[in-house]
Amino acid sequence: MLIAAHPDDESLACSVVLQHAVCAGAAIRVIYATDGENNPWPQRVLECKWRLNGTDRERWGKLRRSEALAALDVLGVGASRASFLALADQKLTELLMSGCRVTLKLLAAIVADWAPTDLLVPSISDTHPDHSALAVMLRLVWSEYLSAKGAMSAWSYVVHGRSSAFFDRAETIRQTTVEIAAKLRAISCHKTQLKLSRKRFFDHAGRSERLIKLNARETIDADGSISSISRRPRSLSIILQRSLRPMCPRKPALFILGHDEVGALRCARMQVPLRSSRVEIFDQANDEQFAVGRYSGDAFAGELAIPVGIFSPVHALFVKLERRGWFFDEAGWLELPAAVHPGPLPGEAFTAEQPWVPADKIENVVALR
């Protein structure tokens, strides 16, 4: 099962993988989270229309659906194997941070009902905001809803960006000239995207596809301007090393997604100041301030200390520094595993190497690259 944020992801990142699955006789399903309907610049150019309304975007989304089905056909995957969830394009980060429980249950039901042996999902290191947000949702689904995974394996892929957090660990998929040619034909089906991005799209055909196998207790290395994260007894410490980004006019905002003490999803938002000062922490869902942290440093380097008690220690934390230049993010999300495990994960038993450790006795560090 391949889960993609947009029509065209299947061709850009997983064409060869899908061809291998077809040759192996595997059953295949492809799930598209959005229709890619909020894609204004190519639509304006192709339709010679500056102002786009809801009807225009709906029409564009249907066109992109048809392109995806044509690309799948080139790769040997029938149209009946594709499903479209029609989530709002360019809004997946907002959905993730403001309440996505219904979407998580939908995704969990889709995966559980079909029970694939291999699940391909976007990487949280992808620099497209929709891709990394969908990746976080699927990690939440993986950890919270799919307790009986059985023999299911999950793999992540990247479409956008060259994050070392992904590429330094990814496995390369072997590909033949025949498979590359089919990938080019699949990419060529996405005519709406080739008008403005032909070179960028065709460049994907010359790159080897890469995957990372996801682990149950995975730490994602530091990425972008975040050089390390550590849980301390009373605070979450985030070390920043920021470069100059002339295309980033706003103050960088830091987001932390986790669970509160009763297990509900909570997303904290804060502006990163340019000099040492207190930091007001807001709940992204209701825009209410609920905590105060401290920044020590300047516009280029420093440490954020955030009260660790605002999040449950038995769940993973996801952290993102938003410094968006034009459209793409500087980096995706980082994942810090749970500090406390109340019991073994499904299929695991406690060992001497995996004891239960109280929160005030553990320091969980994402090391500086």
Task: Locate the predicted segments by residue.
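Active-site rim/loop-helix segments in enzyme catalytic domains that contact anionic ligands
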Residues: 1-114, 139-152, 238-240, 244-247, ...
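Active-site environment of divalent metal-dependent phosphoester hydrolases
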Residues: 10-12, 37-40, 125-131, 163-165, ...
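A short secondary-structure junction signal
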Residues: 93-96, 131-133, 167-168
